[in-house]
Amino acid sequence: MKSLLKRLIALAAAYSVAAAPSFSHHSSQDAANKRELLQDLVTWDQHSLFVRGERLMIFSGEFHPFRLPVPGLWFDVFQKIKSLGFNAVSFYTDWGLMEGNPGHVVTDGIWSLDEFFTAAREAGLYLIARPGPYINAETSAGGIPGWVLRRKGIIRSNSEDYLRATDTYMATLGKIIAKAQITNGGPVILVQPENEYTTWPNVSESEFPTTMNQEVMAYAEKQLRDAGVVVPTVVNDNKNLGYFAPGTGLGETDLYGIDAYPMRYDCGNPYVWPTYRFPRDWQHEHRNHSPTTPFAIMEFQGGSGDGWGGVTEDGCAILVNNEAVRVVYKNNYGFGVRVFNIYMTYGGTNWGNLGYYGGYTSYDYGAAITEDRQIWREKYSEEKLQANFLKVSPAYLTSTPGNGVNGSYTGNKDITVTPLFGNGTTTNLYLVRHADFTSTGSAQYNLSISTSVGNVTIPQLGGSLSLNGRDSKFHITDYDVGGFNLIYSSAEVFTWAKGDNKKRVLVLYGGAGELHEFALPKHLPRPTVVEGSYVKIAKQGSAWVVQWEVAAQRRVLRAGKLEIHLLWRNDAYQHWVLELPAKQPIANYSSPSKETVIVKGGYLLRSAWITDNDLHLTGDVNVTTPLEVISAPKRFDGIVFNGQSLKSTRSKIGNLAATVHYQPPAISLPDLKRLDWKYIDSLPEISTEYNDEGWTPLTNTYTNNTREFTGPTCLYADDYGYHGGSLIYRGHFTANGDESWVFLNTSGGVGFANSVWLNQTFLGSWTGSGRNMTYPRNISLPHELSPGEPYVFTVVIDHMGQDEEAPGTDAIKFPRGILDYALSGHELSDLRWKMTGNLGGEQYQDLTRGPLNEGAMYAERQGYHLPSPPTSSWKSSNPIKEGLTGAGIGFYATSFSLDLPEGYDIPLSFRFNNSASAARSGTSYRCQLFVNGYQFGKYVNDLGPQTKFPVPEGILNYNGVNYVAVSLWALESQGALIGGLDLVASTPILSGYRKPAPAPQPGWKPRRGAY
């Protein structure tokens, strides 16, 4: 048996190491192909980054400040990411939102990054800045401003008119980022120019990048360098082909990174895991592409999204759930990833029409942190377990990944084991998963490995290990627990910490009912059980071996100064590892030299510090919650939670404990259907008296668009400066009596709709689908027209956002508006067209809320969606009880006050439903929801899927007056009413979060040039 075991271990190691050479430690700035560094605070070798000389695993979460337009809440999100055990955040900035007006980059109010940088520094998170200029990110046009779309040059090419268009924005953002670099005491440690720049039409993978593509990347890098950016640059190659890696020439970046989404996007079938993108050899790919830099994944799938007519983000959360996190994230660790960014960790909201047509208002993304900033999804806790393990495992950072081989180390071909071999350390790590990673079945196995006490097969005390369906585990050997050697453990490490008086506390966990085993050197005292039962302890050779079956009740053992907690995974979820503040310049940033506390504390613990004889904690609870200090670097006798001293006691094993009492607060929310609503017609354009003199005449006889127009003039909205929200066209003609039909081919993006009137006569609507970007149709005219009389078509089109694009395709330029038209009995030139979008187009007036927040509807052009419009002359009408009796657009407004209790985070949402009995609630209609001027919901009744629209505190005034407006667009002749609209609260959370200042909410005033 012993010889068979030796052969099995040797064979497994041979297979594993075959293509896994060890690298000698050297700094990449010494490599021949490495450019000279511009600073010395962020450096690297082939294994990892060094920040201020300390080797760090960069574990990052993606979070976009523009998707949460309340700067006072950014710190809350940062703290929740920090509490995951992450040490960084990656963020995009959206050029299209900041420079909607050419040459005018808005950087104040919600568009200022100052508070973002301050909050990151205070929370202790490094930042990876990604200013684009193209960002993708499910944003309209991928973040390219609408005015750039009408330029002749190909987007993302070296065309001079495109490159010059980026200059003002990149210079402005570059200076802002440069000021916030680590070299200036800020949090920014990496910068990414461009985004997923990896293809070009008619250029093969082997030919890419061409010189032109290299020039584009080099131009973006130079813009940043010229602005003062000195931290390393990084690329995110979504093809994983080595594009722009160090040493590749013009356009190369300092660090090479990839991005990948192996779980794909089928949120409608979330239990079916796709297999065709599951990676198996990334460690080799990286060695081929960039052997002198650490393996970096700059975007990895943290959720997914769906579109109009699809499913809600809940399905996306199931697709990339805690099981997927366990399997596919750990697969990445098997490749030795050392810079790891999860896209998204907090998604936020596509408010104000900022999204592309493939998504609805929510950008929850099924992420670990929900759109309304809650952390109840299990994958939040799973990510916390993983990040904290890697944080306390320096051996991982220099380990050499081997090959994952079916049957290696276990003899079970249904199981794949991927080793990571100690490279300068004695620690080896073994990642175990199903050979079929999608398997939902369970497998039994024994693990045969080499340790410092010889070759062993785990478990040694009988039984077998088990791997449940869609699971993956770290097994470790000769793992350093602050000077104590953990010879092996089949249970996973959550964390370990240094306590007072040279004590070490180790936390292990496993799944319910699993058999696990660990071993300690025999020179330690025999482990004793000080809490719990049913633990088997035996001496095997030169080791103490401990075996147990995971249960809800924890076990605690001691072996001299080493204390081991054996937890059920779901109990480990309730534990938090909090870094204590250090001296500058580390302060709240992560560092392997920092002291930590481990506290069992329920829903969320945010921060900790020790003063005198007290441990101060900030955190959140949603039920009465016991606190227990599992480990701390010094002894203290009191616990202060959110500024309140708690009654503390000592547990049987000597841990300090206390209880945070939770009392649900009394909450009073308005009944929206009982409020006094005011109404104004928002489609006066179909009245006989309407004068469109102030509208934009569509007289351009040319376009730079890749799609040629067919009429005498171009009708594309982008060519006239209108880029989002909604569009209204008016086509004037004089009748000749031969009119019987009109043909219209309209474009609004997937999910769009349109309605058409001839004078005051409703001709019908296209109500939209989850597939059509455009819709051509012939419309019969209902009656004969009077020859010689003037007529006008009014066409309302919903603008769902521009597309994203692969480089060079110019897909984002595909026009919105009327593409083609014809009128029977007439030449095309007989119709004279005008249009409007948002008031002023690119010269938009509400700089506070950005260029896309408004559309073409009359009430929006007048600014009536802003607080305190002149409603005294409007009639009273309720959109929920009364609504519209015919096709058209109504605008409804009301106000209410809130007075929610201090000290609680109370997520609020507006919820639409069509459960009312009135027939008109089941017709096709669309609503926009404006809250204190911000458009925070686009509701499509018959298409969906979104019915619930979270609105954060700071947009809603939790202690003050709120102005809410709803546009109601009835697409059918019988009209529409809103079946139901409620303001609802999620469970109030007793919170240590910082109450946010309201986002800027400038109110209504008469608008210059409004029509």
UniProtKB/Swiss-Prot annotation:
GO terms for cellular component: extracellular region; vacuole. Substrate binds at Y92, N136, A137, E138, N195, Y261, Y365. Its EC number is 3.2.1.23. Pfam families: BetaGal_ABD2, BetaGal_dom2, BetaGal_dom3, Glyco_hydro_35. One of its GO terms (biological process) is galactose catabolic process. The active site is at E196 (proton donor), E299 (nucleophile). It is found in: Secreted. InterPro entries: Betagal_dom2, Betagal_dom2_sf, BetaGal_dom3, BetaGal_dom3_sf, BetaGal_jelly_roll_dom, Galactose-bd-like_sf, Gly_Hdrlase_35_cat, Glyco_hydro_35_CS. The keyword ATP-binding does not apply. Residues 1-19 form the signal peptide. It catalyses: Hydrolysis of terminal non-reducing beta-D-galactose residues in beta-D-galactosides. Disulfide bonds join C267-C316. Keywords: Carbohydrate metabolism, Disulfide bond, Glycoprotein, Glycosidase, Hydrolase, Polysaccharide degradation, Secreted, Signal. Belongs to the glycosyl hydrolase 35 family. PANTHER family: BETA-GALACTOSIDASE RELATED (PTHR23421). This is Probable beta-galactosidase E. It comes from Aspergillus fumigatus (strain ATCC MYA-4609 / CBS 101355 / FGSC A1100 / Af293) (Neosartorya fumigata).
